[in-house]
Amino acid sequence: MTIEICKKLHVLIVEARFYDGISDALLTGAVSTLQKAEATYDIVTVPGALEIPGAIAFAEKNSKIYYDGYVALGCVIRGETYHFEIVANDSCRALMDLTIHKHLAIGNGILTVENEKQAWARAKQDEKNKGGFAAQAALCMIALKKRFGEIIKYG
């Protein structure tokens, strides 16, 4: 996507702050990518990964601001209970449902990892930079959506 196209884009970043430091690293990567693309953005914060899809749905349905796309940022670290599977699966499924059923361009940067070491390796901008990757994915999906037209019809 060219910078001229990106300059006209406005993106909403929805970040879960359950792990503050990891969230900061993911956000830094996402913001850096959007700034390099010269896209504008807003940021909202939610308590955890399960709340991210709801925030995106609220913004899409009720916001007076139009967002071309969304970046979902958060981290789910496996614990001793089944809660990890619920949060990891349901947050991802809800984002996919928004993409498929509401035709939203979403970059998914919700980390699902075994431990904090894996989370840091994926969150840091100088390592795997998954926040930046999620922002880039959102920009790519926005471009694809625009290529096929804002109104997508399924045959």
UniProtKB/Swiss-Prot annotation:
Question: Could you tell me the keywords of this UniProt record?
Answer: Riboflavin biosynthesis, Transferase
Gene3D superfamilies, A to Z: Lumazine/riboflavin synthase (3.40.50.960)
KW Protein biosynthesis (keyword) present: no
What Enzyme Commission number(s) does the record list for this chain? 2.5.1.78
Q: Which GO terms describe its molecular function?
A: 6,7-dimethyl-8-ribityllumazine synthase activity
Q: Which residues hold 5-amino-6-(D-ribitylamino)uracil? A: F18, A49, L50, E51, C75, V76, I77, N108
Q: What class of enzyme is it?
A: transferase
The record ties this protein, via CDD domains, to: Lumazine_synthase-I
Active-site residues?
Answer: H83
Residue ranges that the Swiss-Prot or TrEMBL entry lists as coiled coil: none
Reaction catalysed?
A: (2S)-2-hydroxy-3-oxobutyl phosphate + 5-amino-6-(D-ribitylamino)uracil = 6,7-dimethyl-8-(1-D-ribityl)lumazine + phosphate + 2 H2O + H(+)
The residues that hold (2S)-2-hydroxy-3-oxobutyl phosphate are E80, T81, R122
Q: Which GO terms describe its biological process?
A: riboflavin biosynthetic process
- In which pathway does this enzyme or protein participate? Cofactor biosynthesis; riboflavin biosynthesis; riboflavin from 2-hydroxy-3-oxobutyl phosphate and 5-amino-6-(D-ribitylamino)uracil: step 1/2
One Gene Ontology cellular component:
riboflavin synthase complex
InterPro entries with a match to the protein in the record: LS, LS/RS, LS/RS_sf
Record-stated family: Belongs to the DMRL synthase family.
NCBIfam families named among the record's database cross-references: lumazine-synth, PRK00061.2-2
* Purpose: Catalyzes the formation of 6,7-dimethyl-8-ribityllumazine by condensation of 5-amino-6-(D-ribitylamino)uracil with 3,4-dihydroxy-2-butanone 4-phosphate. This is the penultimate step in the biosynthesis of riboflavin.
Put simply, this protein is called 6,7-dimethyl-8-ribityllumazine synthase
List the source organism: Bartonella henselae (strain ATCC 49882 / DSM 28221 / CCUG 30454 / Houston 1)
From the UniProt record, report the name of the gene that encodes this protein.
ribH
